[in-house]
A protein has these predicted regions:
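Conserved alpha/beta-hydrolase
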Residues: 75-89
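Short amphipathic alpha-helix adjacent to the substrate-entry channel of hydrolases
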Residues: 62-78
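Short beta-strand element of the alpha/beta-hydrolase
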Residues: 44-52
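Lipolytic serine-hydrolase domain surface
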Residues: 2-27, 87-145, 149-154, 169, ...
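Gly/Ala-rich beta-loop-alpha elbow adjacent to hydrolase catalytic centers
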Residues: 273-275, 279, 283
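Proline/glycine-enriched tight loop/beta-turn segments at coil->beta junctions
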Residues: 37-45
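Short substrate-entry loop that stabilizes the transition state in hydrolases
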Residues: 54-60
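Conserved strand-to-helix beginnings and helix N-cap segments that scaffold or border functional pockets
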Residues: 60-64, 284, 314-316
Length: 432
């Protein structure tokens, strides 16, 4: 296979449903790319990029177009390989969105949120312990009445009954947020939404602020987790496909082998890995696969944008494989932005879920709630092992100023196409 001059430095490897090759032509193009890069007159800079998983193939191609135009257009020595997650989570969920289970999810959440409006109409109070106790009793009474109404409604099915039962068994923080200090303000979006203004800790004499939409998010997470609905199985399948791709002779393992053969011919070649969201797990799998070969594992730059990796698994890969890198960079959203994301997950949960995909992964899609995710600021602010901090030369949370540059990034999904993020990343690739 002979690649066109414009495509010779940049190729896209598409994955099949099983993590293998979508088409043998992709494998042939990879081998042609390898031959081209190995014969370069100057030591090449090989960049392997993996996009996030919640996109269609068309959107994936569009993202890679932007990466090539903004990140690599002015760097002729960069030779770029992109993983194109051909059958992404987007398509999987789109196919499932009309299924009975998915309809149940939307119905359960909207029914409970709508009914909760009655419980939200508590009178304002001055925050004194005596008044708080009265409000608590009223809230519990309203919740029990709500439970009875839900059970008797003709439109209520068994799943909604179970969700209502779950309401009466909430852990203390959620009880405080959703019942002890239920706000009067009720905000309506596409689905009825209860806005929780604040909560009161039992050991505190004054109100302690709670996150906006805290109860909305908690309810969706509990329904998804409890009933193992399509998003859970889809997320597990996406991760399985990532790891399957790095089993020989599949695409991930083939790319690792190609890069190592190029470095044998071009010992001064540089290698950098970039991953966004699910792409962070691709980077981790690449490092693990390369480590198993026993060859030189030096990497120039590892850049993770809002990565969905387990914090523990990324630590393990680095510890076991002994990877050496010049710089590791992590950029993610501030926790305040993660908690205020509306409509990010369509068609996953549409307007029902008011937070980012990483919050849903951590609280509902992984095996245990509050599962530590590498790209979430909240887990870096909590006590974390020192070796986690030592893995990265720079950790940045946006929106904010990074290396003197203003970066206005407000959504989980837009990192790979944000000109400010890409300009910052380009400068770091050059400086390394």
């Amino acid at each position: 296979v002979t690649l066109s001059p414009t495509a010779s430095n940049n190729i896209r490897v598409r994955l099949g449903d099983d993590g293998g090759w979508h088409d043998r032509r992709d494998h042939n193009e990879l081998l042609a790319w390898e031959s081209h890069v190995a014969q370069a007159s100057e030591p090449p800079h090989i960049v392997v990029y993996a996009h996030g998983g919640l996109v269609s193939e068309a959107v994936g191609n569009s993202i890679i177009d932007t990466i090539e135009q903004r990140l690599f257009a002015n760097a002729p020595n960069i030779c770029h390989v992109s993983f194109l997650n051909r059958t992404g989570l987007f398509e999987t969920l789109d196919q499932l969105s009309n299924s009975r289970a998915f309809t149940w999810l939307a119905r359960a959440v909207t029914s409970v949120l709508s009914a909760l409006q009655d419980a939200s109409a508590l009178p304002e109070h001055d925050g004194s312990p005596e008044v708080r106790e009265d409000a608590s009793q009223v809230a519990v009474k309203r919740a029990r009445e709500l439970h009875g109404r839900l059970q008797s409604r003709s439109l209520t099915d068994s799943i909604v009954d179970e969700v209502a039962n779950k309401l009466l068994q909430l852990p203390e923080p959620q009880v405080a947020a959703a019942l002890l200090e239920v706000a009067r303000a009720v905000q309506r979006r596409a689905a009825a939404r209860v806005v929780v203004k604040g909560r009161v800790r039992r050991d505190s004499a004054s109100p302690v602020p709670a996150s906006r939409n805290e109860f909305d998010a908690y309810l969706v997470e509990e329904v998804v987790r409890r009933f193992q609905l399509p998003p859970v199985s889809a997320w597990r399948e996406m991760k399985r496909r990532v790891h399957a791709a790095f089993a020989p002779p599949h695409p991930g393992a083939a790319i690792v082998a190609s890069v190592q053969r190029v470095r044998h011919i071009q010992p001064d070649a540089r290698v950098s890995l970039i991953g966004h969201s699910l792409g962070g797990i691709w980077v981790e799998a690449y490092l693990a696969c390369a480590g198993e070969t026993g060859n030189d594992l030096h990497v120039d730059t590892v850049a993770l944008l809002a990565p969905a990796n387990s914090l523990a698994s990324f630590r393990r890969v680095h510890r076991w494989q002994g990877t050496v890198w010049t710089q590791a960079l992590l950029m993610g959203l501030t926790d305040a932005e993660e908690r205020e994301e509306i409509d990010e997950l369509s068609p996953l949960l549409g307007t029902l879920y008011p937070r980012t995909l990483l919050y849903l992964i951590s609280n509902a899609l992984e095996d245990q709630p509050a599962f530590p995710i590498l790209g979430m600021q909240k887990f870096w602010e909590a006590p974390v092992p020192h070796d986690v901090h030592d893995l990265f030369q720079q950790v940045s949370w946006v929106p904010g100023i990074v290396d003197g540059q203003v970066i206005e990034q407000y959504s989980h999904g837009g990192f790979s196409t944000n000109p400010q993020v890409l300009a910052w990343l380009a400068s770091r690739l050059v400086d390394s």
